[in-house]
Amino acid sequence: MTELSARLNESSTQWVSSPIKDWSPDWKGNYQAWLQPSLDLVGDTTWGGTIRDLVQLPVEDPSLWANRLIELPGGHCAVTGIRFRNRDISKPFVDIIATTASPDVAGFELLGQVLATYRDFQPLCLRLNVPELNDALRIIETSPTNIGSAHPDLLILARPVTELLAEQLAPAYQAVSLRPCPPSAAAARTFEIYNELEASRPQLREWAVPADAQSLEGAASEDLLFEILVDGNPAGVIAAERTNAYGFTGFCMQEIAIDSSHRGRGIGVAALQHLLRKLPANEHDVLWGHIHPDNLPSLRNAQASGRQIVSAHIWFTPPGYSGMNN
């Protein structure tokens, strides 16, 4: 364990939600293992220079692009990094990767000071992963002093695979089947479905980006990339990949896209139930994914399958900053 890891070891786990802690006796080790690669990039100017060259903004110093350890009053600190929403250079923000500050008024106020150290990038706000969305929003909104404003970015929905397997089968389960699909074909099909959806949901690309062939390679290599069939007819794409994060182990949803002719019939839940039965899950593994709170069809589908909100990313805007649009 590095000195930085030891410093963050206990305090940063305040930001891990209760369900995650309840689901696995190894949650703390899982959390530290997930965090460590980001800690290893603190001060890594080689990595920072690579990101600088890719983004092409007039900020030359590679150390400013690397993950950074920011010292805060009262002996607190935060590991942070400059990021760009959907790789859009007009939407810079600072990611709070880990911190010794607490998820309370004092902690949020401390973290608000981080943005000044990134003035070269003109960040709009901070992004935080909070253990309980409603609590975090209430704390910020009802603070006796103005510490800023906040709104959700992405919800993290998860549940142990063993519990999901115990759920009652969806009415459409028997009509649905899955068959392996190569990444190129799956990506093309997904792109078609997203284009079709965008006509009725113009903000879709702010919520979700269609998985491309490269991003589906991992799911395919794990035999977890499928075409969804309904009564033998193509209906969409579903994919998952082993990804451990936030203190849990398990499988992250990489894609689920249902075409217009099959939407609204419970096909998504049935497809998820078929996928669950193909996961090579260990005892404490979960199925999880990120969903934007305005993406109501995806949110309803995930919750109908039994997944629950276990934490969330929020945009936190201290006074004097522009903030991130929904």
Residue ranges and their predicted role:
Residues M1-L54, Q168-A211:
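Short amphipathic alpha-helix that is part of the acyltransferase structural core
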Residues T2-V16, T99-A188:
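Acyl-donor-binding surface of acyltransferase catalytic domains
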Residues S18-F121, A235-I256:
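Conserved donor-binding loop and adjoining core beta-sheet/short helix segment
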Residues A106-A116, I258, G264-A281, L299-A304:
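Conserved acetyl-CoA-binding loop-helix of GNAT-fold acetyltransferases
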Residues L124, D285, Q308:
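Short acidic/polar active-site loop segments enriched in Thr and Asp
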Residues L128-A136, W288-L299, Q303, W315-G320:
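Conserved beta-strand-loop-alpha-helix junction that forms the acyl-donor binding cleft
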Residues R201-I256, S260:
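A conserved beta-strand-loop-helix scaffold within acyl/acetyltransferase catalytic domains
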Residues G320, M324-N326:
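C-terminal region signature
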